[in-house]
Amino acid sequence: PFYKDILIDSEDSVAVQEDKRSLGHVGPDTVNIGVVRLPSISNFTDLEILEREPDVVVNYLFQSKDFSNKYDCLILPGAKNVMEDAGWLARTGWKQVISRFAEEGGRILGICGGYQLLGVRINDPVGLESDQKEVKGMELLPIITTLEGKKVVRRVTGICLQNQKRVSG
């Protein structure tokens, strides 16, 4: 936490405590990205590469009142507890803000748990993250997520619908 701009992955989300971490500068061709700072944010290092781009500004937004329509994209990052974060989005006004941004044509990207939060519902039948068996999502995507006993992380391949090229990750 003592050295700035050394461009290595942060150890934990301590670095995201600041409101703005981007190295980019606002200009006419700048891509301005807002990231909702979820209480259980994870995989936030996925965004660090964007912060290093000179024509990209990444702002971590802690409260829904911090949001404005100046953003080219809003990102919901990964979450360690999507069940709790879904409730937090509703309680803090983020759900309304994000829904309005989507209705107005705003671009929204969900990464991992953030993608799950954009769906209709999240089920937790075995209580992995919560005593609640299900919570409503943002209802912006027609998906339902069911949390199961064992988490499996693996590389997948597919075809990009826009250009028919093979992708993997």
Question: Which residues does each predicted region cover?
Answer:
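Phosphate-binding active sites in nucleotide-utilizing proteins
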Residues: 32-113, 117-120
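C-terminal lobe/tail of nucleotide-utilizing enzymes
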Residues: 1-59, 64-72, 125, 140-169
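Cysteine-nucleophile active-site neighborhood
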Residues: 79-169
